[in-house]
């Protein structure tokens, strides 16, 4: 049970949808990673990638931060191709059929991870872009929404007393305090809302991450790769954000 997830769902933030689809994105990618590229036909390899692309589109349509996780998917996908090719080369096997299959997979992924996610993302704005005063300039309105959102977040100058640097987050050193009521009720009680992770889960998870990175250092392990890449892809980009 994670306290932060409980709080975020109760105050109805969109982060919960992004996290949900991020989990589905990586679940679908794991299904692909379990396939043997050397023997599995293309029709068996494509369904998990299609599902992964759909979930990616839904995640990014929910919140841009899901795009960070999509970078991790790319690392896992191309890593799978590269290590399979290297393994076959070490065995001295003919690589031409495998290269052809990898090329076809990459072409299909242009549809699954570019066209389809963009279509889903674009469709998410249709309730706004198809309003009577927007419908005649639908594309311009769509682009304007993107630039407005980007400019707002990139130029926002805001501080929060309970903000904390990114390197403190895994240890739950300074939980964020969202709200406190001005006056107490008849029983002398105040209302307050705070978001913090379950210290047991977060600290143990951080130790598990270290173990996963250590396994990767000593040799590729698929579960370790998924855990490490998945976490770092959504965590490290925040090191570049000055406003936390």
Q: Which residues fall in each region the model found?
A:
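Membrane-interface helix-loop-helix junctions at transmembrane boundaries of multi-pass membrane enzymes
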Residues: 42-43, 85-108, 208-229
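Membrane-interface transmembrane helices that cradle and orient dolichyl/undecaprenyl
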Residues: 25-48, 78-88
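Transmembrane-helix signature of polytopic, lipid-linked glycan biosynthesis machinery
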Residues: 60, 215, 232-244
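Transmembrane-embedded, aromatic-rich helix segments that form part
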Residues: 19, 65-87
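Hydrophobic, aromatic-rich transmembrane alpha-helices
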Residues: 182-186, 191-221
